[in-house]
């Protein structure tokens, strides 16, 4: 066990400050003591947090660096906290509205992670729901300041968010459903019902504000522009990239993956078959179909458990606590698939969540096996779980709090490709993996293209990328149900920089591995590389590159 240093103490204090400033983060990380609270989203609270960031950055600079772990912590905290402060100073939080990752969804989805076994647990749920009005009032206050300063989200994102708020405000609000399904009685049941009414009313008020005040003031253009995109890209990658070179690489990658997929389609369905023909053949095979969410959950669990058994000790060295993962069906029904990490003590295991859209009852294993590898092992669960298991060697900021999308999502895509390289996919499942790769390459082209005003493909009429051209690009390259595909497009438009972090992150991970292979020559050991890379936790990718080159 490593002896904690003064810099670790700075990092630990920052975790405690973060838990108080944003209790949602405490719940996400499994930190106790804040499950009854909600954040203050007001401009005043954000200003206080900016002061805390400045203070912590000063302490990080001044603290002695006694070992390599300290050097890594200092580099990562300087990059992450410095960028967060830069974003606050630019006012990015004043336009934080989209359909997938903004205060609206954070406040909705946090209840999925809260314990609900005891009366005390349910009392926390009631307290959080009762605090919703104050939390959303602070959020509205920040959005109003954004209007006054001319920092506003796109109108399309506001319309989507207003629809989500409305869905949370009616008599069938999920908050009322929480209270009704609690199994509690007496005074606690009454408190849950009262709190659910407060939460539903608060979201109704938010929906009216979004519709009547923010939507008329919102910008018509979906694109955020290069200046905002610079910060967004760094937020999700932890690396500085050449946008123009990366866009051209994305175009080339999309073409290469498409050719690879087309060749495999001919192998599956005949010499003249298209990708659509191969997909139709795979979808028609009953062996590839799952009916109902219960069967989907069971298949997710079985597939994840099989991967853990096959990989542990051969390609990776799993901490025994990481061998447990749970497949879950999310109650939100929005169409996303995501992972939530274990709590600090592993009392809450890592979980794969499938948010199944309303009316979707049939699922295809050939297309989704790679998704389980992405969310489970060797993807997010291995990566996040191994970091949490390093708590005795890493401070809590490193093991629990620091999460960089390009590092995490890039690793998960890298993991998908590894499963193909290791021979775990049959031809149909490999087509599914390539389908996912094609989606991620499409995201690079679309996201950089629309937000930076890049020229659209001639086959879509030239000019610059806009909504209709982006939709056609997705329709031509992504095998996804139409409602979910529309949700994806709106996600990219409203959450700039996040979607391309997957494939760009994979690219950087592969560059780092190839660099290590060249340095080590015949002594290169893939399992050792993986173990070392995962042991340092999630890092900004520029920091990771330096660490693994050392």
Question: Which residues does each PLM region occupy?
Answer:
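N-terminal maturation segment of proteins
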Residues: 1-550
